[in-house]
Amino acid sequence: MELVRRAATGAIRFYQRFVSPLTPPTCRYVPTCSEYTRQAIERFGVAAGIWLGTKRLCRCHPLHPGGYDPVPERRSVR
């Protein structure tokens, strides 16, 4: 499973380093959605981390105020 975790975080790092700089900053949150997902994968594993990241991306739109939204310390059922 460590290999899958490293592959997932590596893909996010690739995006952060090479793709994201080519686009204007649009994330409404701190940390950014990609960094949030990377941290969630590191903390909770690939499946739960991607789930948390997906939920975060669904909230990242112009009608949401955004702001500081760190990865939770513990995984919740929601």
UniProtKB/Swiss-Prot annotation:
It is a peripheral membrane protein. Could be involved in insertion of integral membrane proteins into the membrane. NCBIfam families: membrane protein insertion efficiency factor YidD (TIGR00278). This is Putative membrane protein insertion efficiency factor. InterPro entries: Membr_insert_effic_factor_YidD (IPR002696). The lineage of its organism: Bacteria, Bacillati, Cyanobacteriota, Cyanophyceae, Gloeobacterales. The keyword Cytoplasm does not apply. One of its GO terms (cellular component) is plasma membrane. Coiled coil: none annotated. Keywords: Cell inner membrane, Cell membrane, Membrane. The keyword Membrane applies. Belongs to the UPF0161 family. HAMAP family: UPF0161_YidD. It is found in: Cell inner membrane.
